[in-house]
Amino acid sequence: MSNIRLFFKDSLSLNLVSKLDKPQSHYLYKVMRINKGQSFSLFNENGEWEAKIKEINKGIIEFSVIKKLRPSSNEKEIWLAFSPIKLNYLNLIIQKATELGVTKFIPILTERTIVRKLNEKRLNKIIIEASEQSNRLNVPSLDKFTKLDTFLKSNQNTNIIFGDLNTDN
């Protein structure tokens, strides 16, 4: 079996027969050059599963789930509340934090926040790709913008670790 892992948003179970969406089918067939009969991995909150390609029709891959590789796991909740920064750096933060195990991203609005709009579709794509590459089973969530005072008030009984580059300690 190859090391190709894809996130599958629908429920997975043994002997399930389903189809990949167009971008995932394109990735497997045209980029990774996988053919009928070959295997790859699918994962989501149901765990990680081995799937075998049954058919490739008009560029869409139909597969069957043949084996459970890993059960789902309960990760510790690690949230990253952040004030959005310029695009390239934000993409890197999202990618690396996903690889390190963050389970939820919360963009925070402060008085000095310059970036006030996020491309959620793009960030979710980065989150999924980082989850695929880092062997995670759960894909972190991306919340809507929250004002700093609202975030702090709603999380008063939560341990918050604050990082500030401008302090000595």
Predicted segments with their positions:
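Carbohydrate-associated surface elements
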Residues: 166
